[in-house]
A protein has these predicted regions:
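ATP-binding N-terminal substructure of ATP-dependent carboxylate-amine bond-forming enzymes
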Residues: 1-118, 122-128, 147-164, 168
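Active-site nucleotide/adenylate-binding loops and adjacent lid/helix of ATP-dependent enzymes
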Residues: 2-10, 14, 22, 77-81, ...
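Hydrophobic beta-strand scaffold residues
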Residues: 38, 111-112, 140, 181, ...
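Glycine-rich phosphate/pyrophosphate-binding beta-alpha loops
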Residues: 93, 191, 247-250, 317-331
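Phosphate-binding site of ATP-dependent enzymes
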Residues: 195-283, 307-312
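Conserved metal-phosphate-binding beta-hairpin within the catalytic cores
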Residues: 221, 231-232, 289-322, 332
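Active-site "cap" helix and flanking loop/linker of ATP-utilizing ligase/carboxylase catalytic domains
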Residues: 246-298, 330-353
Length: 353
């Protein structure tokens, strides 16, 4: 039987480059070598594309802050990808998860795993994804939006814009939201550039920090409660939701360091919630996925408020982590679909669509 040619792309130009390296090499190790002819492709931080020169079987899972070796630069990316049956873009953040590379695959007419251009770009932008979830009547945290370039612009609910000073943003936020608040770059993942704040001075500093990562900033009211995640998979003609998992962060919130470098951060699978609450979250996860016209794969994150037991949608990730500690493969493993079989399902779905 002829093997399916699979290109696994990882690395990339985003701030999540190192996580993508770990995810990508984890995927390569877990792909069935008898079914697939695997072509690892590494993109460095400058955006140059490389192929591996050693045997796929020798590729080890990279650790954070480790870069791959034994590489050869690809002269013509288009020609190289033309020979592939399917592409697995294990890229997190900008230039990989935001619709840009998906657009390239569409132009080349190549089949690929994951959400298409529109869903990828919308879900990468926290502000615009919130607008869609509002339209779908999915419960979310309260928030305000500002634009930050050489000046600050406040954007109201009707998308009217008003030039505003930093201290006036703080006043607006305090008028509309309660502490604690979270300040987030609109286009960022793995909690990069995200800050939890408890007072006006912290809020000012957090806005300045977020501005380094994006020119559009989201300020959200914090939810005191459980952080619960659900994996979604499009397979066999239907959208399925996994069991839920719970984040037990060693830090105040599930930051980049607590996700990838703090050994005390843990996940609880299944989440410590009732059967009814799990079913509610599973239905909401599928609804959110369909609302953005998702395809293939996503992980949807929620909060359950301690005081009210109410569920709030946090965000949707169209290319979740695939490291050994990542929630997405762990959730499906607990739901009866091991890592290797999960990859089979994702590839099968991509080849059909």
């Amino acid at each position: 039987m002829k093997k399916v040619k699979v290109a696994v792309i990882f690395g990339g130009k985003s701030t999540e480059h190192e996580v993508s390296n770990v995810s990508g090499t984890s995927v390569i190790q877990n792909l069935n070598k008898e079914k697939y002819e695997i072509f690892p492709i590494y993109i460095n931080k400058e955006g140059k594309w490389f192929e591996y020169t050693e045997e796929v079987e020798k590729i080890q899972i990279l650790e954070l802050n480790k870069e791959p070796e034994k590489l050869k630069e690809i002269n013509s990316i288009n020609e190289y990808l033309k020979n592939m049956d399917v592409i697995l873009p294990i890229l997190h953040g900008l230039y990989g998860e935001d619709g840009t590379i998906q657009g390239m695959f569409e132009v080349l007419g190549k089949k690929y795993v994951g959400c298409k251009v529109l869903a990828s770009s919308v879900c990468m932008d926290k502000v615009y994804s919130k607008m869609i979830f509002e339209k779908a009547q999915i419960n979310q945290t309260k928030y305000i939006t500002i634009k930050a370039n050489d000046k600050y612009i406040y954007v109201d609910e009707a998308l009217n814009e008003e030039e505003i000073k930093l201290e006036e943003i703080v006043a607006k936020a305090e008028e509309k939201l309660k502490y604690p608040m979270f300040v987030k770059p609109s286009n960022s993942g793995s909690s990069v550039g995200v800050t939890k704040v408890e007072c006006a001075k912290e809020l000012e500093n957090a806005i300045i920090t977020a501005k380094k990562y994006d020119k559009e900033i989201l300020i959200e009211e914090g939810i005191i409660g459980k952080e619960v995640e659900c994996a979604v998979l499009e397979a066999d003609g239907e959208v399925k939701a996994s069991c839920t998992g719970q984040i037990l962060s060693a830090e105040e919130f599930y930051s980049y360091s607590s996700k990838y470098t703090n050994a005390e951060s843990r996940t609880l699978i299944p989440a410590d919630i009732s059967k009814e609450k799990q079913e509610e979250i599973q239905k909401l996860a599928i609804k959110a996925f369909k609302a953005v016209n998702g395809s293939g794969i996503s992980r949807i994150d929620f909060f359950i408020e301690d005081k009210t037991n109410k569920v709030y949608l946090n965000e949707i990730n169209t290319m979740p982590g695939f490291t050994k500690i990542s929630m997405y493969p762990q959730l499906w493993n607990k739901s009866g679909l091991p890592y290797s079989k999960l990859l089979d399902k994702l590839i099968e779905n991509a080849l059909k669509n």
